[in-house]
């Protein structure tokens, strides 16, 4: 609010009029938080990857219990499209699974022809 009052007021107007705010408040608030921290985290990741990972640790215990889930979440934090579009998140998640698919190991061309589970994205 102090850095850019116009942007803050605009954001407050968007918050109060969002249908997601009414339907699923926790998800909406999480999305708003991510939109605010993504630029800062991205700059920190480029300037100092070690500090970036260290900064994420207090917010995320997945690094200890499940490194694969942590890396997946880290990729989503760095990609604003994932925050804005859940279909992009689903697509990226499937792309991460493709290397473990037997089709992709035997024949990469076949792996791309496999249907996407959970509905069409395109």
From Swiss-Prot:
Keywords: Repeat, Seed storage protein, Storage protein. One of its GO terms (molecular function) is nutrient reservoir activity. Pfam families: Zein (PF01559). It comes from the Eukaryota. The alpha zeins of 19 kDa and 22 kDa account for 70% of the total zein fraction. They are encoded by a large multigene family. Structurally, 22K and 19K zeins are composed of nine adjacent, topologically antiparallel helices clustered within a distorted cylinder. Belongs to the zein family. Zeins are major seed storage proteins. This is Zein-alpha B49. It comes from Zea mays (Maize).
């Amino acid at each position: 609010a102090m850095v850019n009052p116009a942007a803050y007021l605009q954001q407050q107007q968007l918050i109060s009029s969002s249908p997601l705010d009414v339907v699923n408040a926790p998800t909406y608030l999480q999305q708003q938080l991510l939109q605010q921290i993504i630029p800062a985290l991205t700059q920190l990741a480029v300037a100092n990857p070690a500090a970036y990972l260290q900064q994420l640790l207090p917010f995320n215990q997945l690094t200890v219990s499940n490194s694969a889930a942590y890396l997946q979440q880290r990729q989503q934090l760095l990609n604003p499209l994932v925050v804005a579009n859940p279909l992009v998140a689903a697509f990226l998640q499937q792309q991460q699974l493709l290397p473990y698919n037997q089709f992709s190991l035997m024949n990469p061309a076949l792996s791309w022809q496999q249907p996407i589970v959970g509905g069409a994205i395109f």
